[in-house]
UniProtKB/Swiss-Prot annotation:
GO CC list: plasma membrane
Coiled coil: none
Naturally occurring in which organism (per UniProt): Frankia alni (strain DSM 45986 / CECT 9034 / ACN14a)
Pfam family, one: Fer4_7
Subunit structure: NDH-1 is composed of 14 different subunits. Subunits NuoA, H, J, K, L, M, N constitute the membrane sector of the complex.
Record protein name field: NADH-quinone oxidoreductase subunit I
Sorted UniProt keywords: 4Fe-4S, Cell membrane, Iron, Iron-sulfur, Membrane, Metal-binding, NAD, Quinone, Repeat, Translocase, Ubiquinone
Homology family: Belongs to the complex I 23 kDa subunit family.
Binding site for [4Fe-4S] cluster 1: 53, 56, 59, 108
């Protein structure tokens, strides 16, 4: 050990005194996350409250940590939870295993699963870190109805995915607007326009429920 070695160590300590601290006074002050931060998952809903999850289990197959468990079930005319033939009756995410990689989000064909800005997942109970469907479902927004209930946006599953996201919802259209339209149904024309815009990469996602947490609606 040389004579000047201790002074070199003091120099490193002295230089760090002028650097911006990287720690936060948590939980009094919380660090703002990036807009596309990979936090806790959320199961999204359609504008009428039906669930977007169709119980296909692709997210569970894509998970490299085997953290997702899904059980699908069939919808009936008396009990409908999603527009499709099936829905996710059981949905669990084990955050003791989850690595928050986002591969499940990419695998989801209906945009039912997204990731929020919520990162507060610490707990003193292993059981409480296995989130159930009720914990992951997005809260009901204005105009939504808790399932089960019939389809409100159309008569088939296709109406939910080809409709214009920027168009008013059926229960938002006034009698005056219907009269001005001459009573004609232009849903076919709107659907064709939506398909053309999505093909051109100009699609809108205004109908997605904003994720929980610090951020508002997440860019997609």
């Amino acid at each position: 050990m040389g004579f000047f070695d201790p002074y070199k160590g003091f120099g490193v300590t002295f230089s760090t005194m002028f650097k911006k601290p990287t720690t936060e006074q948590y939980p009094e002050y919380k660090k703002e996350t990036a807009p596309r931060f990979h936090g806790r998952h959320q199961l999204n809903r359609h504008p009428d409250g039906l669930e977007k999850c169709v119980g296909c289990e692709l997210c569970a197959w894509a998970c490299p940590a085997d953290a997702i468990y899904v059980e699908g079930a069939d919808n009936t005319e008396t009990e409908r939870y999603s527009p499709g033939e099936r829905y996710g009756s059981v949905y669990q995410i084990n955050y003791l295993r989850c690595i928050l990689c986002g591969l499940c989000i990419e695998a989801c064909p209906t945009r039912a699963l997204t990731m929020s800005n919520d990162y507060e997942l610490a707990d003193d109970s292993r059981r409480d870190l296995i989130f159930t469907k009720e914990q992951l479902l997005a809260p009901l927004a204005a105009g939504m109805e808790a399932p089960p209930h019939p389809m409100r946006l159309g008569s088939s599953e296709t109406d939910y995915y080809v409709r214009d996201p920027d168009a008013p919802l059926p229960w938002q259209v006034t009698d005056e607007q219907r009269a001005a339209a001459g009573g004609s149904d232009s849903s076919t024309d709107r659907a064709a326009d939506v398909i053309d815009r999505r093909t051109a990469g100009e699609h809108s996602r205004a109908d997605e429920v904003p994720a929980h947490g610090a951020g508002s609606e997440r860019p997609r």
